[in-house]
Amino acid sequence: MKSSSRLVQAIIALLSGLFAIFINPGLVDKTVNMFLMGMTKKGTAPMGAVPAVRLFVSFTWRGVEVFAGIALLLAAYGFIKSKKWAFPLALVSLATMPIGSFYTSSFAGYMVRKHAYAPSFTAFIVGLVAFWLLIILEKRGKEMWAMMVPLTLLGMIGTQAFAFSEHGLRGIFQNGGFQAGLTASIKDPSVGVLRYSGPLMAMVLVTLFVAIYHIAAKKESGWWLGMLAGLGMAIAAIPVHFARPKASFSLAGSNAFAAGQAVKGAGTPSIFTSVYFLAGALGILLVIVLLIPFFKNQLTTEE
């Protein structure tokens, strides 16, 4: 690869890393605090279990993104020195931003309810654009598309796996609080299904990050891990659609969200509008893509 391309990759990694370390934390704070103020009567009421889950998950992931930013600084040095590990390290680090910021920017339908831009969504844009640019600079022709498509699908699945793993806890606590929600999960299948899907979603999330690294490193294991992530998403998400058909899970409910706190007029989600069913379908799509000979041959040939 030309030294000029390596230099551009290094600059992208450096700037993205500095953004993740010094700028994004403030954007996450601003976005999450706006939501929490509404859930605690402008900071005067005790915080319940549901917003507490939002808080802890958001700020834990903010720490992950800062740590990924540090890794990006190391990757920038690696690009300059033409180290093979720089590219996979940079990609998996960049993936943390769109996956995490999609969650912090969209919970409670903030951008839909308020018709306003969530500050933390900036990290989604920065991370995704940098992610794609590094792939374009690293690969050419067939190799580029063979990597771009499955890695993008893995990132899309990651946004869902992140949100749904958190919902595995929050959805339980929404049924009367911490203790009452746990009790409800014993008898109510629509609550109990979250005890099934939540842990699986967390495992899918971890797996897809490892898959991104291995695919970027041209390891055959990346293909297998991608298959595992896709199948895991389908098996975890689709049952929730049938056991927990809530209007708030319907893409058709976006206009209903904007009217106020309650979701009205959205109706029961169908397989075409259910976020859970569509997430499962996305997992199946990834598996189909990986099984196509063009992608399979490219991704199972190690360098």
Where are these regions (language model features)?
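Topology signature of small-to-medium multi-pass alpha-helical membrane proteins
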Residues: 1-303
